[in-house]
């Protein structure tokens, strides 16, 4: 199956790369309309996935990741329209000059070619990934999780119907419908078809892709995000930030998983936070010895807890004596995604931003803002936690490479 699908997307990438900006934008606008028109059809297929998940004892949080409704489909359509309105990076000139030999040298943005995307649960990723790849002149091979197979299949069917109506090759998107681990591994090693592979999901998925892939990988999204409440923090502000970062949507990668608190304010802050956050949703605190003494409920934290992306109503808590200890702790356990400090001390804020090794480092704000739309990129294909090629929310430019174009008049060397 991978051979067949790989050949299709590889061949299609040449055609998609030739499309004009206008043609791509019109297509994305029409696809947005088509999603709205097919809302009932999409929800019907999504309900099959939800029914299967219910049989397997799906959690409240996983149900949220999987569920599609009219509002979420409308949001997907809005995302398509926003991508259509973004500037097209393809053929953008990055630099141009004439060198000492009289050669005219231009550097332009070009598509990566064929993109592989392996993801879990969220069917909206199907639309996000396609729209960004299509806008940047790439074809895409998708492999979603078995829990969202019906949702992913109907979304790809709708995309293909629109491609054929627009007389564009429907190989611009393909879905690996065989969700077995064996086929996934074949995809990870399909380097003769795929130019890059982007995993988006749990730490287990991302680590498996890193271990097995021969296709170049852009690592995304494990979000063990931490908030440090400094001794000078406004405790009302800190409480609101932690509650938002932990409870608004705990199943996403920019939710807070860990809390670090300066020991000088722990006795006052932690009981206040515990009281307020449990009004929103009951939280399981996994805390160190000092924190457990002032929390009314909690269990002792292990070292693993400080490095875990829970994706649940669980929060690890660490108390520290100073900023250096906080930075050391975060850099030890962080997934390099998003970290935040709540402080009124300008020096501490600057030191934290300078020394924390992460894609996004906040002062006095929730980690929930790490997002392509918020950062002005439009939709995102993922949030890269590595340092090569792309880091942070990955928008259109992250799905491009560059090419040098050199014009001469007979020069030799």
Curated annotation (Swiss-Prot):
Organism: Lactococcus lactis subsp. lactis (strain IL1403) (Streptococcus lactis)
Catalytic activity: L-glutamate 5-semialdehyde + phosphate + NADP(+) = L-glutamyl 5-phosphate + NADPH + H(+)
Pathway terms, separated by semicolons: Amino-acid biosynthesis; L-proline biosynthesis; L-glutamate 5-semialdehyde from L-glutamate: step 2/2
Major subcellular location class: cytoplasm
Entry's Gene Ontology BP terms: L-proline biosynthetic process
Record-given protein name: Gamma-glutamyl phosphate reductase
One term under GO cellular component: cytoplasm
Listed PANTHER family: DELTA-1-PYRROLINE-5-CARBOXYLATE SYNTHASE, GLUTAMATE SEMIALDEHYDE DEHYDROGENASE
Domain of life: Bacteria
Subcellular location: Cytoplasm
